[in-house]
Amino acid sequence: LIMAGRAQVIQELDRSFSSASRRPILTSVISGARGTGKTALLTFAEAQARERGWVSVSLVSLPGLLEEAYEQSCRQADHVIDMTLRTKRISSLGIGPMSVGISHSETTTPGWRTRMSVLLDRLAEKGAGLLMTIDEITPRLDELIQLTSAYQLFVREERRVALLMAGLPHNVSLLLNDKSVSFLRRAESIRLGRIADHEIERALRDTFAQSGRSVSDGVIEEAVHAIGGFPFMMQLVGFNMWEEGGTSKDIKDARARRGIRLATEEFKTRILLPSYQELSPMDRRFLQAMLQDEGDSLLSTIARRLGKTNSYATQYKN
């Protein structure tokens, strides 16, 4: 698995999963626009953790999050520990002749934090930790607040546990502003943006080379330009070029270019259009004012085009 443009984060995570002491990056909040590779980074981190002997679970911020976190943790930890919680109880009692029956049955279900503590204790006995990743965070989900609050206590208890959460920038901001999880403001903040063109080019070349296939230099350059630094677009371009190439080791230029076109249309439909539809009328006016410039836009210029003051444009941007 090739992960382009995120070397520093990947290296720090890898060190953290193998370190005897706790590192800040084990509690991280990842933010970025659609298509910047948030989910891919979470997936890569999970693979890293498993290689280092951790148990990892993938979660989505939806109702039922707490129980899903526990059930998935038990399931993924099954190869490390036995999570069956059973106790003995008297099931029958007879008088003359006296008889007592003993059976095994499930105990009364304790609270979520208690069950998670038992799980973490048993993992610790085996030298293993637990990584929870939560994608598409929904800041107004009560269970997310409960989970992060309990996680803070796990950290204070010096348990071997990690939490990586990812979401769109405005959702991340709303979560961090929640007073009940203020400790997250001290978490590692990872902001994902575009990847440099040379990183994209190297990743494409390495991917095809490792698989014994080739694409011409000219088409690689076209692909890099079409990708524009977006990790998800890189996935789409690579996949479609590969598929259009059929079984040929040397992918013909025409087929590779068709793959680039298909990826571009898919990116517009899956990423750009939903992002645009979420914008407010003023958001769209702001963007239209920016589009008049070929390079970076000055806030003073945008304010003039919108008929607003410089201070308004500054506040709106922030």
Language-model features: locations:
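Conserved catalytic segments around the Walker B and adjacent sensor/switch elements
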Residues: 46-64
